[in-house]
């Protein structure tokens, strides 16, 4: 059970609602529409670089990636860093548009795919089963480009990844075109980070709502206090504080010690901290290299807690943080 194809004409698989207003993105759409891809070899089948609003964004089979210049970006009284991610982006593109491998009945495939998505929503992220369902959802897309898999259909793979990139860029373009003073920070496979004037937060949310209605997808929003940016794959994001009860506060402090915590006037709050790429050190998966963890920990302490590296190194007596694997 597999679907083999010869040539995929990309113009035939682009969603009808995809449209842009800027010259840069109209050229991108024209470029994608002109592609005819060898279905037997999708890897490296399309690459495109686009410069827009002083940020270079890269497109390819692996997704869309773009980042502003490296630096530390912080929210203040006038500006706020907004992060908006699409909920289970690639799986939901297939579910909402009723896409399936050519050899599967569409309704049965999409209904079962949606069942896994809905089951995952019922499980807290702290529960390992949430991660299991995440892998099931994401690997189903990935296996559509694996000839050894019974999900194999290169057109489905290309349909999801190209429409995913174009759809996300519609949101990115509208934010940048319609919000005066908006600053692009990150564009990744399933979301965008943008610094905008606080006075335009309602406009930002309206743009996101319009996008959700057009695409039938959902966005999850966060606000960052600070974004320490090296590149699109390596950064630290410090969210705003969230108030919780003392029981939840203690639970989160135990499971996520790298978050920020505070108690003021008997109010308990925490600020999630996202660690990506080489800055990550918390609960690394078994296949990840745990060598020299003292380095990302020292960087974290410096940028998040204003602790000088020499002071942190003097205080950190955990010998495992200094070990190097062979």
Regions found by a protein language model. Name each.
Residues 1-326:
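Conserved acidic
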